[in-house]
């Protein structure tokens, strides 16, 4: 199945669901209800990294991509979210071009951005994906 970014670029109408409270069952219900993606709110919602990791893993079991709303474009949070396998991030409070550029830099691998590179995460299939293939896939498919 094409990535969420590829589907959006192709003009496909996509329908997602917003999740603000941590609940594995809700993630699975949204996935089996045929939503195109799940948006997990880590700015206003109480989800921590452990809960987020579980939410992303459950969504992936059902081939449903996850976008995570991060607070203030926090570079460290963006790295952790994407390393857990979220296909994209949504960042509020971007007021300037420089804010947007910093967000893209945090989310994307070089040469587009400056995201740290680690293939031993969930996003890298725990080291089983060739590093060049990993980098290329995420450069092409990360949604910001």
Range-by-range predicted roles:
Residues 26-54:
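Glycine-rich, proline-tolerant flexible connector loops at the mouths of alpha/beta enzymes
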Residues 49-83, 105-113, 137-140:
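Alpha-helix-loop-beta-strand connector modules within alpha/beta enzyme cores
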Residues 76, 88-144:
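Conserved anion-binding
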Residues 14-19, 38-40, 66-70, 89-91, ...:
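Hydrophobic faces of well-ordered beta-strands that scaffold small-molecule active sites
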Residues 1-16, 128-142:
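N-terminal amphipathic alpha-helix/helix-capping segment at the start of soluble metabolic enzymes
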Residues 17, 30, 41, 81, ...:
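Conserved, mostly hydrophobic/aromatic
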Residues 19-33, 72-80:
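Short, acidic/polar
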Residues 33-37, 83-88, 108-109:
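Glycine-enriched alpha-helix->loop->beta-strand junction motifs that scaffold or abut catalytic
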């Amino acid at each position: 199945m094409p990535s969420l970014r590829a589907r959006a670029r192709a003009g496909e109408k996509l329908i997602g669901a917003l999740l603000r409270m941590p609940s594995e069952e809700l993630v699975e219900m949204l996935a089996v209800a045929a939503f195109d993606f799940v948006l997990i709110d880590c700015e206003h919602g109480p989800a921590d990294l452990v809960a987020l990791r579980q939410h992303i893993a459950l969504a992936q079991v059902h081939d449903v991509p996850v976008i995570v709303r991060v607070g203030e474009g926090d570079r460290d949070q963006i790295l952790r979210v994407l390393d857990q396998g979220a296909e994209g991030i949504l960042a509020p409070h971007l007021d300037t071009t420089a804010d947007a550029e910093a967000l893209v830099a945090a989310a994307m691998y070089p040469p587009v951005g400056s995201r740290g590179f680690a293939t031993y995460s969930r996003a890298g299939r725990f080291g089983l994906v060739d590093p060049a293939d990993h980098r290329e896939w995420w450069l092409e498919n990360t949604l910001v």
